[in-house]
């Protein structure tokens, strides 16, 4: 979808390299946030955001010939992973007109459909604008405002962290010449195989175009790392979910050994694709979150997440608060028999898996301890997407599809099972959007007033 009339030539400096293009200037939209040291003492940070490399125009280093069109690689430019990486460049982005991404001070708005583009995924850059901003979440608090009033069933306006490399993988994989400036290095607990480039090489080998998405496919390789989903939500449902992995750093996997959404064996990889989720509706509290409910999704809200550590400094509890209309509101309590509390702990996760009859893959990958080591350096991700694999039913409807809705853990929200089908939501709600703003980070109880 990105054709350009300009031409240029480039000298290849490596046999294998993930190149940076120059046909479109890359200018990161600015976004401010606040670093707090004590309650009421916060300092503004001048950051910016960058769009993920998977959304970018990928073309020949010698001219504007597409390396990737629709969901297919050019066979001449990309006969294999290494040749493709040497032949192809990631180019700059026009954030607003192409991707529907706008910023204003401390506010970031992501529009759902802009022209032929659907959704977006962005990373917070550091103040130098050279690498990703990293956060040590242990014994810390992360707070933001969000407006989900324009996010219907089937959409997910997500704010989360993963253990990406701060430089986008450049130091580990010198063949990666694009780096964080061009949004490289993504990884998560699904070990996604739809990435066009991983570890400085293309993902051409074994690439299979998607049968239901004209823009995507999956390759032989995936990119794995621990993931902390602070916020996956629309105006009907929300979930808070840690996902541990066996390694605290980004790793590349191959084929079905990746596990996750993109593989035949969901639990065959080194990460937990399910995580231990706290969705108030799924936990039996159907009056807590939604339009006109305790947390009214018709209005902007403040979301506070605290990462509590034990005496050894390891993550032991994840707590959630909301602030709306001047009121501090604790997370909903579980109403599921045998599962107590309103925070994520080891005991909560064990009891929840048992009550819902779910495989405890979370514990198999060492639970909270399995994500704790990664939390000393995580990258902030903000995205808006629809779900070509499960129509977002796992977030806002009944899931799995063949389960009985009245069984514990099956109902996750009030959305109809067909409402999240991508063709439906893209056709009916292209003007949907989410706005994140007022991001704050600091020690426990430093980013909001408990007596608000």
From Swiss-Prot:
Major place of residence: secreted
EC main group: hydrolase
One matching Pfam family: Glyco_hydro_7
Species this chain originates from: Aspergillus niger
Reaction catalyzed: Hydrolysis of (1->4)-beta-D-glucosidic linkages in cellulose and cellotetraose, releasing cellobiose from the non-reducing ends of the chains
Similarity-based family: Belongs to the glycosyl hydrolase 7 (cellulase C) family.
Function summary: The biological conversion of cellulose to glucose generally requires three types of hydrolytic enzymes: (1) Endoglucanases which cut internal beta-1,4-glucosidic bonds; (2) Exocellobiohydrolases that cut the disaccharide cellobiose from the non-reducing end of the cellulose polymer chain; (3) Beta-1,4-glucosidases which hydrolyze the cellobiose and other short cello-oligosaccharides to glucose.
CDD domains: GH7_CBH_EG (cd07999)
MF terms in GO: cellulose 1,4-beta-cellobiosidase activity
Highest taxon of source: Eukaryota
Protein EC: 3.2.1.91
Factors inducing expression: Expression is under the control of the xylanolytic transcriptional activator xlnR.
Gene Ontology terms: cellular component: extracellular region
Protein name, per record: 1,4-beta-D-glucan cellobiohydrolase A
Catalytic residues identified in the record: 227, 232
GO biological process terms held by the UniProt record: cellulose catabolic process
Key words of the record: Carbohydrate metabolism, Cellulose degradation, Glycoprotein, Glycosidase, Hydrolase, Polysaccharide degradation, Secreted, Signal
Glycosylation sites: 62, 285, 335, 402, 445
Signal peptide feature range: 1-17
Localization, UniProt: Secreted
């Amino acid at each position: 979808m990105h054709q350009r009339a300009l031409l240029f030539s480039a000298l290849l400096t490596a046999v294998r390299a993930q190149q940076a293009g120059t046909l479109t200037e890359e200018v990161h939209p600015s976004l401010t946030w606040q670093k707090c040291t004590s309650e009421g003492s916060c300092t503004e940070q001048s950051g910016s955001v960058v769009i993920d490399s998977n959304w970018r125009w990928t073309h020949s280093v010698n001219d504007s010939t597409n390396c990737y069109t629709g969901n297919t690689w050019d066979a001449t430019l990309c006969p294999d992973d290494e040749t493709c990486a040497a032949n192809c460049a990631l180019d700059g982005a026009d954030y607003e007109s192409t991707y529907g991404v706008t910023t204003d001070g401390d506010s970031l708005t992501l529009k759902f459909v802009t022209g032929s583009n659907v959704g977006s995924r962005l990373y917070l850059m550091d103040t130098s604008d050279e690498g990703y901003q990293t956060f040590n979440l242990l014994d810390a608090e992360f707070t933001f405002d969000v407006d989900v009033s324009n996010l219907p069933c089937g959409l997910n306006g997500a704010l989360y962290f993963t253990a990406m490399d701060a430089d986008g993988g450049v130091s580990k994989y010198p063949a990666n010449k694009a780096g964080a400036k061009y949004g490289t290095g993504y990884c998560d607990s699904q070990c996604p195989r739809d990435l066009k480039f991983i570890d400085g090489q293309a993902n051409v080998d074994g690439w299979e175009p998607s049968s239901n998405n004209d823009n995507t496919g999956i390759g032989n390789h995936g990119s794995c790392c621990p993931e902390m989903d602070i916020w996956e939500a629309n105006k009907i449902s929300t979930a808070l979910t840690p996902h541990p992995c066996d390694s605290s750093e980004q790793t590349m996997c191959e084929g079905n050994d990746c596990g996750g959404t993109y593989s035949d064996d969901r639990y065959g990889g080194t990460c937990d694709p399910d995580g231990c989720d706290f969705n108030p509706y799924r936990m039996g509290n159907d009056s807590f979150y939604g339009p006109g409910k305790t947390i009214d999704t018709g209005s902007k809200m403040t979301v506070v997440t605290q990462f509590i550590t034990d005496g050894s400094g390891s993550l032991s509890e994840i707590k959630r608060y909301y602030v709306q209309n001047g009121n501090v509101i604790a997370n909903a309590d579980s109403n599921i028999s045998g599962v107590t509390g309103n925070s994520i702990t080891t005991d909560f996760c064990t009891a929840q898996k048992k009550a819902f009859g779910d495989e405890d893959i979370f514990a198999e990958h060492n639970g909270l301890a399995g994500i704790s080591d990664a939390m000393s350096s995580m990258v902030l991700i903000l995205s808006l997407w629809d779900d070509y694999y499960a129509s977002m039913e796992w977030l806002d409807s009944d899931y799995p599809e063949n389960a009985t809705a009245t069984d514990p853990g099956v109902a996750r929200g009030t959305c109809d099972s067909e409402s999240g089908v991508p063709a439906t939501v893209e056709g009916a709600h292209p003007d949907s959007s989410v706005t994140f703003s007022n991001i704050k980070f600091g020690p426990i109880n430093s980013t909001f007033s408990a007596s608000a």
